[in-house]
Amino acid sequence: MFDQLAVFTPQGQVLYQYNCLGKKFSEIQINSFISQLITSPVTRKESVANANTDGFDFNLLTINSEHKNSPSFNALFYLNKQPELYFVVTFAEQTLELNQETQQTLALVLKLWNSLHLSESILKNRQGQNEKNKHNYVDILQGIEDDLKKFEQYFRIKYEESIKQDHINPDNFTKNGSVPQSHNKNTKKKLRDTKGKKQSTGNVGSGRKWGRDGGMLDEMNHEDAAKLDFSSSNSHNSSQVALDSTINKDSFGDRTEGGDFLIKEIDDLLSSHKDEITSGNEAKNSGYVSTAFGFLQKHVLGNKTINESDLKSVLEKLTQQLITKNVAPEAADYLTQQVSHDLVGSKTANWTSVENTARESLTKALTQILTPGVSVDLLREIQSKRSKKDEEGKCDPYVFSIVGVNGVGKSTNLSKLAFWLLQNNFKVLIVACDTFRSGAVEQLRVHVENLAQLMDDSHVRGSKNKRGKTGNDYVELFEAGYGGSDLVTKIAKQAIKYSRDQNFDIVLMDTAGRRHNDPTLMSPLKSFADQAKPDKIIMVGEALVGTDSVQQAKNFNDAFGKGRNLDFFIISKCDTVGEMLGTMVNMVYATGIPILFVGVGQTYTDLRTLSVKWAVNTLMS
C-alpha cells in the first residue's frame, strides 16, 4: 500500500494528512518532495493519465532523499490551479500494483474534494468574500471545518472499501493491515497455545519426518507439528475468517444522533458532483459542430417556441437511449410523453437547444418516478408500532413478508435486511415460510447462524438458544419443515404469536419463489396476506431481468387482492448490470411502488438506499 497522503498549499499549510499504516505523519517526505519540485520542476517530471486516473492528469516524481531517516520514494501528485493546492500520494517503489493503487487513491481524493466544493470555499476565503474573524483576518479554512471532517471520514471509508481491499496482499498483511512480523508473532503465540492444548489432551510425543525410502529423517518439535494441525481450533478460526468476509460494517452506514443506523450514500455525493460536471459539459458541447452555421443555430434559435415537430426526432432518440438501458418500451413511451406535455408550447431558454431542453425535462421525469421515501421513515414506523402495548403489556411485532420470482435473491436480501434491522437494535425473528424449495430452510439456518455470530462472538455455530431454536438473543429462526400452501399460512400465524410472546421486534417471513405468469402459483399469495397480515410486503426484483420486470411487478402487486398491494421493492444484483438500470424505472412505473434498497453484492453490508441522482445520471449518460 502507499505511504502517505497530503493536501497542502504552496505556502506549506497542510490541509489534510493521512498515513496509511497509522504511523506518525512524516513531514520529511513532504519537505523532500517540495525541495525536489523546486530544484527540478520539469526534467524529473512524468505525466500520468490512464483509466485509473479518472480523467485527471497526474505527475510522478522519484525523490532520492538526503535524509537518513527517509529513504528514496516516489510521489504521485496533482496541482490544482484555483486555488493553488498540491495533492500528493507517496509510495516506496514503482510496481504495477502500487502504481494502480496510488492512481486510484489520488483520483478518489480529488473526486471527494471537488464533490464537497472545498476548493470553491477556500477560494472565497482567499478573496475575502467570507466573514472575517476577530483579528480582521479571513483564514482559508474558515467555515469549512465540518466539510474537511466529512472529507476525512468519506475518504477513509471509500479507500478501505473499494481500493485497499482490492490491492492488499493477504500473504503480506493481516486483516487489520499489520505487517508480516507482527503476524508471525501472533502466529507463534497461537502455536504455543495449541501446543499446550495438545499436551493436555495426551498428545505428548514428538512428531517424525519420513524420507522417501521409509526411513525416519528426524524428530519434529511441537511447533512444527502445530503448523500441520488443522483440527477444531484452527477450523474455528477459518470459519471466523469466512464469516468476517460476509460483512464490512465500516462501509455499511453510520448512526445518526438519534441512534438510527442508516445505509451509507457516499456514492450519491460523488455521482451528484459527476452529474454537475456532465451537465456542464453537455451544455458546452450540445452536439453542434464548431462551424459558423452551428454557432448561429445554437445562439440565434434559442428562446424559440417548441412544437411537436421540433420534438419528434429528439424524443425518438431519447426513447431509443432509454430502451438500450433496459427501460421497457411502454415505460420509455410514457416518459417521453411526459416530456412532450411538459415542453410543447413552452420556449427554450437563451442559448439552449431543443434537444438539451428535452434532456432536462426527461431528467426531471425520471427523477419524479424514482423519488420515494428513505430508510429512516421505515424505522420510525417500526418504533411507533413497538411503542404501543396492549392490556397484558405486550407489543405486536412489525411483520415483513418477502416475495418475488425464483432465483432473484429473496433469502439473501432478507438476511441483509435482517442485519440492517439488527444494527438498529431490533430483535429479529426470521421465519422459514418457503416450504416448497428443497434446502430453503437450511439456507436460512446458515444465514441465522452467521447473523447470530456477528452479533455475539461467543455464539457457537450449531448450538441452540435457551428456547431450543437456532440463533441467540438477537436473531432466531422459526421453522416447521416442508409442506403445502396450508402449512405456509399456519407457520406464519404461529410465528407471529410466538414473536409476540417472546417479545421480538421484527418478523421477517421468507416465502417461496414463484413464476409471475402462473396463476396457480400466484393465487396462494392472497390467502397468505389475509392470514398473516404483514405490515410491509417487499418484492425482490433483480436488475438483470430487463423489460419483463414490468409484468412481474404488476402481477405481484395485483396478487394480494383489492386493498392490499406491495409496499416496497428491493432491486438485487445492481452491481452486475453497469449502466443498464432500466429495471428500476420499469418496476416503479408499473406500480408506483418505491424502491427501499438496492443490492450491490453478496455480503450482508451490500445494501444501499437508492441514489436517485446516480440512477438518473446513469440512465441519461
Curated annotation (Swiss-Prot):
Biological role: Component of the SRP (signal recognition particle) receptor (SR). Ensures, in conjunction with the signal recognition particle, the correct targeting of the nascent secretory proteins to the endoplasmic reticulum membrane system. GTP hydrolysis may enhance the fidelity of and provide unidirectionality to the targeting reaction. It is important but not essential for cell growth. May be directly involved in mitochondrial protein import.
Keyword Phosphoprotein appears in the UniProt entry: yes
GO terms, biological process: protein targeting to ER; SRP-dependent cotranslational protein targeting to membrane, signal sequence recognition
Miscellaneous: Present with 2000 molecules/cell in log phase SD medium.
Post-translational modification Phosphoserine, affected residues: 239, 523
Region described as Disordered: spans on this chain: 167-217
Source organism per UniProt: Saccharomyces cerevisiae (strain ATCC 204508 / S288c) (Baker's yeast)
Protein name listed in UniProt: Signal recognition particle receptor subunit alpha homolog
